[in-house]
C-alpha cells in the first residue's frame, strides 16, 4: 500500500477510536471515521499485546494488510480506517480472512458498488 494511504500518527488513531464507529467479527475490528470530501482514504493496522509477541502481532497485521490491499480498488474515498487484528486472524486460512475483512468493510459502508 502506498505511503500516502497509511494512517500512522497516534493522534489520527485516537481520533478514529474516539469519534468513529466500529464493526467487528471473529477476525478483526474495523473503526471508521468519515473525513471531508476529497480526502484520500487512509488505513492503519493494529494488534494488541494480548495477541502475542511482536512476531505474531506483525504476522497478523501483514495478513490484514494484504486482505485490505486486495480490496483497495473498491474502497470509497474520504475515510480514516483502523483495522485491529483478533486471534482468529492468525488461525484462519487466508481466503476466509479475506472474506471476513470484505464483510466488515461492506458492513461499515466502505465498499463502492460494483458495476
Swiss-Prot record:
One of its GO terms (cellular component) is ribonuclease P complex. Pfam families: Ribonuclease_P. GO terms for molecular function: 3'-tRNA processing endoribonuclease activity; ribonuclease P activity; tRNA binding. HAMAP family: RNase_P. RNaseP catalyzes the removal of the 5'-leader sequence from pre-tRNA to produce the mature 5'-terminus. It can also cleave other RNA substrates such as 4.5S RNA. The protein component plays an auxiliary but essential role in vivo by binding to the 5'-leader sequence and broadening the substrate specificity of the ribozyme. Consists of a catalytic RNA component (M1 or rnpB) and a protein subunit. This is Ribonuclease P protein component. It comes from Symbiobacterium thermophilum (strain DSM 24528 / JCM 14929 / IAM 14863 / T).
Amino acid at each position: 500500500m502506498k505511503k500516502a494511504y497509511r494512517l500512522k500518527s497516534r493522534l489520527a488513531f485516537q481520533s478514529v477510536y474516539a469519534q468513529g464507529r466500529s464493526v467487528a467479527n471473529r477476525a478483526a475490528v474495523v473503526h471508521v471515521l468519515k473525513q471531508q470530501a476529497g480526502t484520500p482514504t487512509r488505513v492503519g493496522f493494529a494488534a494488541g499485546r494480548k495477541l502475542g509477541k511482536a512476531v505474531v502481532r506483525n504476522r497478523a497485521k501483514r495478513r490484514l494488510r494484504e486482505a485490505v490491499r486486495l480490496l483497495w480498488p473498491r474502497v470509497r474515498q474520504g475515510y480514516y480506517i483502523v483495522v485491529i487484528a483478533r486471534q482468529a486472524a492468525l488461525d484462519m486460512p487466508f481466503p476466509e480472512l479475506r472474506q471476513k475483512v470484505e464483510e466488515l468493510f461492506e458492513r461499515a459502508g466502505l465498499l463502492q458498488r460494483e458495476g
